[in-house]
């Protein structure tokens, strides 16, 4: 395969497809690196603050690929040294350890959960200490603790108030999005991974935009928990690859399909070409978002396949060019660009991908996606 975008070039059609799909809501994002990189992480461990050894746990050697070791390491760092110290250590390990790089989003969930415990479940206090590193997982994890602390008896009457502070500060800002998305994760924990009950809880939110973001957290958690031995997902079916997306309300279908590709890839042995074909069978209005989901997964996989920006760009191009239609390829690149920015909280890797594309129209369209998405994240 050539370094450029299409051998199957169709004039300016790729650019035309790029021009609209940067408008996808920020909350419509990948199901994260967990399943794609075979890192299985299950429910949060809401560990109370303890007087543990202030020196971080050593997760090297035989524990170098032990998620529970790193989880405890960062929880202890939060309790003993603070959130800033935990992130400083995580960023250092991210640069050195491939396992940490691959599981970074869920490790930031752990930091967020511990921070919310430390700050008594107060959203403004917890968020004031936050960091967007590795896909804003800190804020999602924080909301898992907040929802758990409120409890099932009061959560529906309190749901609209949970994200009041970030909503009032700037409606639909990144903090507001992370709060609403995190509620979805929290509801799944509260209701024992019951997808439809958790979606009903999202439905208790007054704003349609918040409901959509919340549902994204629900679907992300559903995919993650497929192999959870203590509480496996009941809402994934190997013989119905699009379920539960086919059964949810229309307002929740896009957040579902964009994450469902992660599960579909696993069931197809990480064969992207086969999943491109499956996405082509999705109900018409949601076929494009399925391709965007594949782009998210392509970007996630690239962190495993390459260590340099150029390697990542090559890996993503190789995947997205498996799409047989212009729409499939262009939406895949859109998803990849957004996921790279989402993960790294900058546009360096995304721009490297865009600059590798040909023809010029495709490169320009890709750069527009990157520019607009960066602006959206900075609101």
Protein language model features and the residues they cover:
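Hydrophobic alpha-helical membrane-insertion segments, chiefly the h-region
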Residues: 26-42
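Intrinsic disorder/low-complexity segments enriched in polar/small residues
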Residues: 10-11, 21, 49-50
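Non-catalytic tandem-repeat scaffold regions and their flanking low-complexity/translocation tails
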Residues: 38-379
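N-terminal Lys/Arg-rich, disordered targeting/topogenic segments
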Residues: 1-18
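N-terminal Sec-pathway targeting helices
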Residues: 15-30
